[in-house]
Protein backbone atom coordinates (compact mmCIF):
# COMPACT_ATOMS: atom_id res chain seq x y z
CA UNK A 1 0.00 0.00 0.00
CA UNK A 2 2.97 2.33 0.55
CA UNK A 3 3.95 2.12 -3.11
CA UNK A 4 0.37 2.82 -4.18
CA UNK A 5 0.14 5.77 -1.76
CA UNK A 6 3.30 7.21 -3.30
CA UNK A 7 1.50 7.26 -6.67
CA UNK A 8 -1.65 9.24 -5.80
CA UNK A 9 -2.91 11.31 -8.69
CA UNK A 10 -0.63 9.50 -11.13
CA UNK A 11 -1.43 7.06 -13.89
CA UNK A 12 -0.83 3.52 -12.75
CA UNK A 13 1.75 1.54 -14.64
CA UNK A 14 0.94 -2.04 -13.67
CA UNK A 15 4.12 -3.47 -15.18
CA UNK A 16 6.40 -1.12 -13.23
CA UNK A 17 4.51 -1.42 -9.95
CA UNK A 18 4.24 -5.21 -10.12
CA UNK A 19 7.97 -5.37 -10.85
CA UNK A 20 8.75 -3.22 -7.79
CA UNK A 21 6.55 -5.44 -5.64
CA UNK A 22 7.87 -8.69 -7.12
CA UNK A 23 4.39 -9.96 -8.03
CA UNK A 24 2.57 -10.58 -11.30
CA UNK A 25 0.38 -7.93 -12.91
CA UNK A 26 -2.63 -10.23 -12.42
CA UNK A 27 -2.07 -10.41 -8.66
CA UNK A 28 -1.50 -6.64 -8.50
CA UNK A 29 -4.79 -6.00 -10.30
CA UNK A 30 -6.53 -8.38 -7.89
CA UNK A 31 -5.09 -6.50 -4.89
CA UNK A 32 -6.13 -3.14 -6.35
CA UNK A 33 -9.64 -4.48 -7.00
CA UNK A 34 -9.86 -5.51 -3.34
CA UNK A 35 -8.63 -2.07 -2.22
CA UNK A 36 -11.20 -0.42 -4.48
CA UNK A 37 -14.09 -2.66 -3.38
CA UNK A 38 -13.25 -1.98 0.29
CA UNK A 39 -13.28 1.77 -0.51
CA UNK A 40 -9.63 2.34 0.42
CA UNK A 41 -8.69 3.55 -3.06
CA UNK A 42 -10.53 4.98 -6.03
CA UNK A 43 -9.31 4.25 -9.55
CA UNK A 44 -10.24 7.13 -11.86
CA UNK A 45 -10.44 5.95 -15.49
CA UNK A 46 -9.17 7.88 -18.48
CA UNK A 47 -11.89 9.66 -20.46
CA UNK A 48 -13.22 7.72 -23.43
CA UNK A 49 -15.31 9.30 -26.18
CA UNK A 50 -17.56 6.27 -26.50
CA UNK A 51 -17.56 5.32 -22.81
CA UNK A 52 -16.54 1.76 -23.57
CA UNK A 53 -13.49 -0.18 -22.44
CA UNK A 54 -13.16 1.78 -19.19
CA UNK A 55 -11.64 -1.31 -17.54
CA UNK A 56 -8.81 -1.44 -20.05
CA UNK A 57 -7.74 2.19 -19.91
CA UNK A 58 -5.13 3.91 -17.80
CA UNK A 59 -6.33 4.75 -14.33
CA UNK A 60 -5.19 7.31 -11.80
CA UNK A 61 -5.19 6.16 -8.20
CA UNK A 62 -6.59 8.12 -5.26
CA UNK A 63 -6.84 7.22 -1.56
CA UNK A 64 -10.24 7.76 0.03
CA UNK A 65 -8.54 8.47 3.38
CA UNK A 66 -5.99 11.26 2.96
CA UNK A 67 -4.69 10.70 6.50
CA UNK A 68 -3.87 7.08 5.71
CA UNK A 69 -2.25 8.15 2.45
CA UNK A 70 -0.11 10.74 4.27
CA UNK A 71 0.96 8.17 6.87
CA UNK A 72 1.83 5.53 4.27
CA UNK A 73 3.79 8.13 2.29
CA UNK A 74 5.81 9.11 5.35
CA UNK A 75 4.43 12.64 5.66
CA UNK A 76 4.58 13.22 9.40
CA UNK A 77 4.15 16.99 9.60
CA UNK A 78 1.69 19.50 8.24
CA UNK A 79 4.64 21.36 6.67
CA UNK A 80 5.45 18.27 4.61
CA UNK A 81 1.86 18.19 3.37
CA UNK A 82 1.74 21.90 2.58
CA UNK A 83 5.20 22.40 1.07
CA UNK A 84 6.25 18.88 0.11
CA UNK A 85 7.05 17.65 -3.36
CA UNK A 86 3.68 15.92 -3.65
CA UNK A 87 1.49 18.55 -1.97
CA UNK A 88 -0.27 19.34 -5.25
CA UNK A 89 -1.09 15.65 -5.76
CA UNK A 90 -2.38 15.36 -2.20
CA UNK A 91 -4.66 18.36 -2.83
CA UNK A 92 -5.82 16.81 -6.12
CA UNK A 93 -6.53 13.57 -4.23
CA UNK A 94 -8.59 15.49 -1.66
CA UNK A 95 -10.67 17.29 -4.32
CA UNK A 96 -11.40 14.13 -6.34
CA UNK A 97 -12.44 12.18 -3.25
CA UNK A 98 -14.69 15.00 -1.98
CA UNK A 99 -16.46 15.11 -5.36
CA UNK A 100 -16.81 11.32 -5.30
CA UNK A 101 -18.22 11.40 -1.74
CA UNK A 102 -20.72 14.14 -2.63
CA UNK A 103 -22.24 11.85 -5.26
CA UNK A 104 -22.07 8.62 -3.27
CA UNK A 105 -23.68 10.27 -0.23
CA UNK A 106 -26.70 10.92 -2.47
CA UNK A 107 -26.76 7.29 -3.56
CA UNK A 108 -25.35 8.01 -7.02
CA UNK A 109 -22.30 6.34 -8.55
CA UNK A 110 -20.89 9.09 -10.78
CA UNK A 111 -19.24 8.56 -14.14
CA UNK A 112 -16.01 10.42 -13.45
CA UNK A 113 -12.92 10.35 -15.64
CA UNK A 114 -9.78 12.30 -16.37
CA UNK A 115 -8.73 13.71 -19.71
CA UNK A 116 -5.13 13.19 -20.75
CA UNK A 117 -3.90 15.99 -22.98
CA UNK A 118 -1.32 15.24 -25.63
CA UNK A 119 0.80 18.26 -24.66
CA UNK A 120 4.05 18.15 -22.74
CA UNK A 121 2.58 19.45 -19.47
CA UNK A 122 0.56 17.09 -17.35
CA UNK A 123 -2.51 18.61 -15.78
CA UNK A 124 -5.75 17.20 -14.52
CA UNK A 125 -8.72 17.94 -16.70
CA UNK A 126 -11.61 16.35 -14.92
CA UNK A 127 -14.78 15.08 -16.61
CA UNK A 128 -18.15 14.56 -14.96
CA UNK A 129 -20.93 12.89 -16.92
CA UNK A 130 -23.63 15.60 -17.35
CA UNK A 131 -26.60 13.36 -16.56
CA UNK A 132 -25.44 13.14 -12.92
CA UNK A 133 -25.20 16.88 -12.33
CA UNK A 134 -28.14 18.18 -10.30
Model regions and ranges:
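Accessory nucleic acid-recognition modules appended to NTPase machines
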Residues: 1-133
